[in-house]
A protein has these predicted regions:
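Preference for the N-terminal adenyl/adenosyl cofactor-binding alpha/beta module
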Residues: 1-21, 84, 154-388
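A short, conserved, highly charged catalytic patch centered on acidic carboxylates
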Residues: 1-109, 117, 122-152, 158-166, ...
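Extracellular structured ligand-interaction cores
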Residues: 65, 115, 219-221
Length: 388
């Protein structure tokens, strides 16, 4: 620890020389990272040159990138967003970028720094202002005087769970809502809204067909959100929902009708069963449930945003497995969606975890696979293996 203090004191002196020279504004973000930020975290025990421990510039196609991901025994422990010297760390968009990416990845902590200042946030708190999510902040002048706090970001600290303990003691982990729980809850809410709306406006339809139609529509909406965030499709859903929704009285076509027309276009593009014609496309839906569902799939403005390009496949797979394992039933209040273990067993609704897919691809498919068509997840994993 004393050796770390000496290295950090040297960085502080170097920073003050730059500050006094009046050249602080000349430093770009990359120069700041090279001269100050990476040496700071090296002093805290992280091996910056080891890609298994610190990964540089992890991208998120729907919203820029974060600069570093820090790993401990293969597990992500925090993301770091770096800014150039003298950046205004009070800008909320700086912190939100790191928090948003960390939350979607299921990582507890997000760090924002320009070396002069450093802020640590709990990215899993989705309610309240940024101040409620901030665990601590520290100025470079206090790096030595308040070294125990800075040391919370050291590799040794994460090995011993010190930041977790600090966050617990300061009530900064009490409202934690993991991405898998929140997404699962929102997907189930979307399904409930759809089934109730379809049931209300299409009373002659069979309940099993209603269930199938709701599932089909929700499948398409989730697919489009993933495609949007991965840069494959433009943000069609939000644009369509807000444009038509805001001018509902003037438009002859509502969001639901516009979507069904869009599905015909997408069927020609993707040529898959996902967008093939289904009876629900001719059903009625007039209580704006589709608009509400689209908004849910983007997140809650000011609190959390879904970035489907960042959400791990294990999270999506687990949520999807749980979602498919529900059955639509009649109840005294009308319609209910309940969990059905029998349905899961009969239809084989079980998600294959990523580590199993990795093993199969690397040990069975990789040596012989040429141009065979396999599922999207297997194809993605195989591509990763070839690039490695």
């Amino acid at each position: 620890m004393e050796e770390a203090k000496k290295k950090i004191q040297s960085l502080i002196e170097k920073y003050e020389q730059v500050l006094n020279s009046g050249k602080i504004g000349d430093y770009s973000e990359q120069e700041t990272k090279n001269a100050f930020i990476t040496p700071l975290f090296e002093a805290l025990g992280w091996d910056i040159s080891n890609k298994d421990e610190v990964s540089a510039e992890e991208s998120q196609k729907s919203g820029g990138r974060v600069d570093y991901g820090f790993y401990l025994n293969g597990r992500l422990v925090f993301y770091l967003e770096a800014k150039p010297l003298k950046a205004d760390l009070e800008r909320e968009d700086f912190a939100k970028q790191a928090i948003r990416y960390s939350w979607n990845k299921g990582v507890d902590y997000a760090v924002l720094t320009d070396f002069e200042g450093l802020k640590v946030f709990n990215s899993q708190i989705i309610e309240g202002a940024l101040m409620d999510r901030r665990i601590f902040e520290i100025n470079y002048k206090d790096y030595i005087n308040n070294f125990e706090r800075l040391w919370l970001l050291s590799k040794e600290s994460f090995q011993n769970g010190l930041l977790d303990k600090y966050a617990d003691e300061h009530s900064k982990r009490l409202k934690k809502i993991p991405i898998n729980e929140k997404l699962d809850k929102d997907i189930q809410e979307c399904r409930k809204l759809l089934t109730e709306s379809f049931r209300m406006w299409n009373t002659k339809e069979d309940i099993d067909l209603i269930d199938e139609g709701a599932q089909k529509l929700l499948d398409r909406l989730v697919f489009l959100r993933v495609a949007e965030d991965r840069g494959i499709e433009p943000h069609t859903l939000k644009e369509l929902s807000r444009d038509l929704g805001s001018q509902r009285e003037k438009n002859k076509k509502d969001v639901y009708q516009a979507l069904t027309s869009k599905f015909r276009e997408l069927d020609d593009i993707y040529n898959s069963n996902l967008f093939s014609e289904h009876p629900f496309e001719k059903w009625e839906e007039h209580n704006q449930s589709t608009e509400e569902i689209i908004e849910i799939l983007y997140g809650k403005p000011g609190y959390y945003d879904y970035d489907f390009s960042a959400i791990p496949s294990d999270v999506l797979g687990g949520v999807y497995e749980n979602y498919l394992g529900h059955r639509l039933e009649k109840s005294k209040k009308g319609t209910a969606v309940s969990k059905d273990a029998k349905k899961r067993k009969e239809q084989g609704i079980y998600y294959t975890p990523t580590f199993i897919v990795d093993y199969i691809v690397k040990n069975a498919l990789s040596p012989i696979l040429d141009k065979c068509f396999i599922s999207a997840l297997f194809c993605h994993t195989f591509s990763s293996c070839q690039a490695a």
